[in-house]
């Protein structure tokens, strides 16, 4: 799920009127378990369409069965095989093609950017920082890369390999879609695509980097870092993180 100035699909919204500062309700975290991609996609759009000015922002933590997703302006030619046996879903986020599957954390960010007084670029930066901080907690150094959206390995044998991807849709000033972080996956499906439109781009997971991380622990760390960057460290400390990972 790549994100860049051209990988963020948005609908125009009027600038908010200036007003006194209003407290922003803390983000609600929901663990949706192992869920078909189409179910999450439909639920995100329904949630966003039904939002009011009082709707509390949410982060959804999900794990998907194998699926390729192609962004709104994506080129199907980036799927390199005719019949991979893995479904392809065309979606309304920005970016090109990516893969989701077991062992990957997917976080969907359903946020009111106007209420939070966030630009899209600032939101992207906060998401990227949360991923970088999460990986740092496991002694993995990672970086952004100019012109190639996502989070990449900073050094070593796999320097430059992609470990996390981002993609957003902004509708009426509210975001959906989000990020994916590879923990311990079967990486072979990435070989059948040009990940996020980049031919030959290596994709890795934390296990490839010799980090035996528990999916639940990484998910909790990621949630804490996302909330800390959005709502502050104190909010992150007070947020329940009772996430349970299942392979069912």
UniProtKB/Swiss-Prot annotation:
Enzyme Commission number(s) from the entry: 2.3.1.181
Molecular function GO terms recorded: lipoyl(octanoyl) transferase activity
Site, Lowers pKa of active site Cys: residue positions: 162
Cross-referenced CDD domains: LipB (cd16444)
One GO biological process term: protein modification process
CC annotations in GO: cytoplasm
Active site (catalytic residues): 196 (acyl-thioester intermediate)
Catalytic activity: octanoyl-[ACP] + L-lysyl-[protein] = N(6)-octanoyl-L-lysyl-[protein] + holo-[ACP] + H(+)
Keywords from the named record: Acyltransferase, Cytoplasm, Transferase
Domain BPL/LPL catalytic: 53-234
Primary location: cytoplasm
Pathway in which the depicted protein is active: Protein modification; protein lipoylation via endogenous pathway; protein N(6)-(lipoyl)lysine from octanoyl-[acyl-carrier-protein]: step 1/2
Compartments, record wording: Cytoplasm
Residues reported to bind substrate: 93-100, 165-167, 178-180
Coiled coil: none
Function: Catalyzes the transfer of endogenously produced octanoic acid from octanoyl-acyl-carrier-protein onto the lipoyl domains of lipoate-dependent enzymes. Lipoyl-ACP can also act as a substrate although octanoyl-ACP is likely to be the physiological substrate.
Misc. remarks from the entry: In the reaction, the free carboxyl group of octanoic acid is attached via an amide linkage to the epsilon-amino group of a specific lysine residue of lipoyl domains of lipoate-dependent enzymes.
Family: Belongs to the LipB family.
Name of the molecule in the record: Octanoyltransferase
Organism: Burkholderia multivorans (strain ATCC 17616 / 249)
């Amino acid at each position: 799920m790549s994100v860049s100035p051209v990988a963020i699909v948005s609908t125009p919204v009027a600038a908010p009127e200036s007003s006194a500062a209003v407290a922003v309700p803390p983000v609600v975290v929901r663990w949706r378990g192992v869920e078909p991609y189409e179910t999450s996609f439909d639920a995100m759009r329904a949630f966003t369409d039904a939002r009011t000015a009082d709707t509390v922002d949410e982060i959804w933590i999900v794990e998907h069965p194998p699926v390729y997703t192609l962004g709104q302006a994506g080129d199907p030619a980036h799927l390199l095989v005719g019949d991979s046996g893995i479904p392809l879903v065309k979606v309304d986020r920005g970016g090109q093609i990516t893969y989701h599957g077991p062992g990957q954390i997917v976080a969907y960010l359903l946020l009111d950017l106007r209420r939070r007084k966030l630009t899209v670029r600032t939101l992207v930066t906060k998401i990227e920082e949360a991923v970088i901080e999460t990986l740092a907690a496991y002694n993995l150094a990672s970086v952004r890369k100019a012109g190639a959206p996502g989070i990449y390995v900073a050094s070593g044998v796999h320097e430059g390999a992609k470990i996390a991807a981002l993609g957003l849709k902004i509708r009426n000033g509210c975001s959906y879609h989000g990020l994916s972080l590879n923990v311990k996956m079967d990486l072979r499906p990435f070989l059948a695509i040009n990940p996020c439109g980049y031919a030959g781009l290596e994709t890795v997971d934390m296990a490839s980097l010799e980090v035996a991380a528990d999916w639940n622990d990484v998910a909790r760390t990621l949630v804490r870092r996302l909330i800390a960057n959005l709502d502050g460290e104190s909010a992150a400390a007070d947020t329940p993180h009772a996430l349970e990972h299942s392979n069912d």
